[in-house]
Amino acid sequence: MKHLWFFLLLVAAPRWVLSQVQLQESGPGLVKPSETLSLTCTVSGGSVSSGSYYWSWIRQPPGKGLEWIGYIYYSGSTNYNPSLKSRVTISVDTSKNQFSLKLSSVTAADTAVYYCAR
């Protein structure tokens, strides 16, 4: 029982510490092939202008693992997954405390659950 409690505390503590910052994705649920997927992530309880973090987009295709799409720093500098780089744009709007993802020319291979992350 002691081991179980230790495990639970170890897992739960980081979530409690970080719970003040929340990220909420918004955008269309469906996009037609060849169109552009546009998603926005709104940050609450923190600021995208914080110089301590990179703001990321990741996705998880059905039945597969997580795939990193890219990240942006508050200054606007970006880094993208090489396999998606030609189709991806990530931008930040510090006035709205948001960052956004645009993925152009989508195909069935882009079917996934998309997440924003810090």
Curated annotation (Swiss-Prot):
Residues 45-54 are annotated as: Complementarity-determining-1. GO terms for molecular function: antigen binding. Disulfide bonds join C41-C116. Its main location: secreted. The keyword Lyase does not apply. Residues 55-71 are annotated as: Framework-2. Residues 20-118 form the Ig-like domain. Residues 117-118 are annotated as: Complementarity-determining-3. Residues 79-116 are annotated as: Framework-3. It comes from the Eukaryota. V region of the variable domain of immunoglobulin heavy chains that participates in the antigen recognition. Immunoglobulins, also known as antibodies, are membrane-bound or secreted glycoproteins produced by B lymphocytes. In the recognition phase of humoral immunity, the membrane-bound immunoglobulins serve as receptors which, upon binding of a specific antigen, trigger the clonal expansion and differentiation of B lymphocytes into immunoglobulins-secreting plasma cells. This is Immunoglobulin heavy variable 4-61. The gene is IGHV4-61.
